[in-house]
Amino acid sequence: YNLIASAFGHHIYESRWLRDQKYLDQYIHVWFRGNGGQPMKKLATFSSWAADAILNRYKVNGNKEYMLDMLPDLESEYKRWESTHRLSSGLFWQGDVQDGMEESISGGRKKKYARPTINSYMFGNAKALSQMALLAGKKDEAALYEHKADTIKNLVENKLWSVKHGFFETYRTDSLANVREAIGYIPWYFNLPDANKYDLAWKQVTDEGGFLAPYGLTTAERRHPLFRMAGCCKCEWDGAIWPFATAQTMTAMANFMNNYKQTVLNDSTYFHLMELYV
């Protein structure tokens, strides 16, 4: 079907505003049931925050019946990721290409590193599954997924936060990657970080040595010696500006501004960055 798995969650977030929801109904069903009643194979490879997105779609259209019909599919997907991508630390690993973010500074196509992406997605999915379970009257399952979310949150804050750089980073085999990348903002996409402890990270969006560039926000900090040094491919995430990354970062920024008491950013900053990009 020429589907793109890496942005599946983003597609749901965007399409939930369509007046005619039959297209998104079918799109979700194709991904989860379009392979002879089973999920499409790419869904088992590329990172996804489908459960979170489907819950947020429900908050727009109010179709609880459709959402709860998808609950078994979403639970199966979550358990599969737990069985295939969880490290001994409890964090989840992913290759950068399977995040849709290949040739990054911090990762690699076959590197099993704990990235802010997959761990934030799994947190968001666990929180969503907990809320869905409550709506389905399954209190024990709701408590289980809430516990899973809390565990991931603590691991992200304690293992992926760089005190040195004031940023969420990728954790390699035995240390942080020592580079700020736009994926370090994804925890706020799901309101994961505690308030007032990690606000410092957002100073980098207004710093020209950080992510601020003439045409928007870069995918890696501009001061890093490996910024835009890959030089190998058409899709490079070592600093190039991408719509996918910009959408994630700006959503995370909106959450940070709307849901946290903070003094780092204001409305003018947000709209200036949006104007630069568009």
Question: Which residues does each PLM region occupy?
Answer:
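Aromatic-rich carbohydrate-recognition surfaces in CAZymes
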Residues: 2-103, 115-123, 239-261, 267-278
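Surface-exposed helix-capping loop/turn segments at secondary-structure junctions
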Residues: 87-88, 131-140, 160-166, 260-261
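Extended glycan-interaction surfaces of carbohydrate-active proteins
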Residues: 1-2, 18-41, 83-114, 154-241
